[in-house]
Amino acid sequence: YMAEGAKDVLVLDGGASATYAARIEGSDKLEVRNSPSDGAEREVCSSLLIVSTAKSTGVFDHASLTPNNDLYTPGYEVQFSASGIDTAGFPMAVPADATWALADDSKDMGTIDAKTGLFKAGDKTGTVNVQMIQGGKVIGTTAVEIAVPDNIYFNAEEVSLGFEDESDLSLVVRNKDRDLNIKDGDIVWTMSTEGLGTFKGNTFVAHSKDSLH
């Protein structure tokens, strides 16, 4: 770190319990941004706080777009959303005349509704660069990936369910060690024992007690 130009370095707990929380652009809430070993922030902890004393200006600067850097299968419908950011980094309304568009290098990756931001992926794989435009100027950008699975497995050999319970059966779908969002129909499900339940998309729904004879 010193070689990179740091003058002072603090070494905190480097274990898996370390928790990072931040207020991301477009939000007024502090949220945990990593995956601590306990699954959540500990009730008792030592903390280092970085607090901004800036005040909202109410002057629009740019739009923060989500999702970002997520993976989806071909044909997936992705709903993009935007939050306005003022010059001090505080949330504000997005200009009413702002519209959605695909960047020139992504126009062959699918279609996007200019008003709603609903993107429908095509059959190609690769990066999709999405823009928000106002008055011919790009005021926000984000990107997602369209990919196919290279690893599909279950996290558990058995799953116990009650009547009418729903479960994803601990299915994990990944591409290059990253979680991949799949749509209904991407996986064809079969059961060795009929009558125990049905699939609703990629979710298994156990039958009710009355349905068993």
Tell me the role of every PLM-derived stretch.
Residues A18, A98-W100, I187-W189:
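Short beta-strand elements bearing conserved aromatic residues within extracellular beta-rich modules
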Residues G58-P67, D150-E157, G197-F199:
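Proline-enriched interdomain boundary motifs that mark the N-terminal boundary
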Residues Y76-F90, V130, D165-D179:
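Beta-strand-rich structural segments
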Residues A101-L118, N155-E157, I182, T190-H207:
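Low-complexity "stalk/linker" and mucin-like segments enriched in Ser/Thr/Pro/Ala/Gly
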Residues T125-G136, L212-H213:
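A short beta-strand micro-motif common to beta-rich folds, especially ectodomain repeats
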Residues V138-I146:
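Edge beta-strands of extracellular beta-sandwich domains
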